Structure formats: C-alpha cells, structure tokens
Amino acid sequence: MTLGPVARDADTAAFFDATASGQFLLRHCPACDAISAPQSAQCERCAATGLDWRPASGDATLVSWTVSHGKPGTDPVILCIAELAEGPWWWARLEAAEPEALSVGAPLRIAYRHPAPDSEVVPVFVPDGAAAATG
C-alpha cells in the first residue's frame, strides 16, 4: 500500500511548508503556553483561538499500531499512534521492518516522505536510530 497524494488548503499551508523543509510544527497557545496537535483550531487547555506554530523535536513514543492489509498484491502498512515528546498524539504510517518486534513505549522519530510529484511532503514515523531519509 503506497501513500497517496496529499493536498494542502489554507489551514494546512504552514504545516506543509514546514514538512517540505523537514520540520514538524505543533500549535502553541500564547494565552496559556499549551501545545496542541497541528490540526487544532483552538487551545485544548483554555479554548483560546489565535494559536501560533512551534517546531516539534521530532521525538515520539509508540502508543499503539495496527497492520493494514490493502488490495491483493500490495504490501501491508503499519499505521500507528505516537505520543510526541511535546505531548500531543499523532497518527501516521510507521516504517518498521517487523511489526512483531514493535512494543508500546518504543522510541520513534519523525521522518518525511514525498509520496507523489503532486503531493505534499508528509510525516511518517521510523524507529529511533533508523535512517530518516526523505523519499
């Protein structure tokens, strides 16, 4: 199963500008200093709007995963939920060779992939220490 094209809109432009340069952005609340997931329109702690963007460290911890089996003739894909070092949870593809070797709490890193010429660069997770080359 391959990653399909991902398109930006006005709400995601800053996020995808950052992923294109190898950076993952989170939402920051100037009112209470809380960090929220990138898709947040208001602060998850105080409900303030007017959030700004802050770069994430790229470190994460595996919370859960599943193996998705696509159409016949395609390779299965590992999809995961990871807790970012800054607190928010994010789900994405996990590029790991052996799903059987995964364990809750395993350290992960964010890597970036450009799945198609007409697609935005998207974040994926890789086991910490794995090559994080863009491709």
Indicate where each model-derived feature is located.
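Short nucleic-acid-contacting surface segments enriched for D/E, G, S/T with interspersed K/R
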Residues: 96-109
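Short, conserved beta-turn/loop elements at beta-strand boundaries and strand-helix junctions
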Residues: 66-71, 114
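Short aromatic-glycine-enriched beta-strand elements
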Residues: 70-81, 119-122
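Residues immediately within or flanking Cys/His clusters that coordinate Zn2+
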Residues: 23-26, 33, 39-40
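Short, cysteine/histidine-rich loop/knuckle motifs that typically chelate Zn2+
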Residues: 28-31, 42-48
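Short functional micro-motifs and their immediate structural scaffolds
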Residues: 37, 50-52
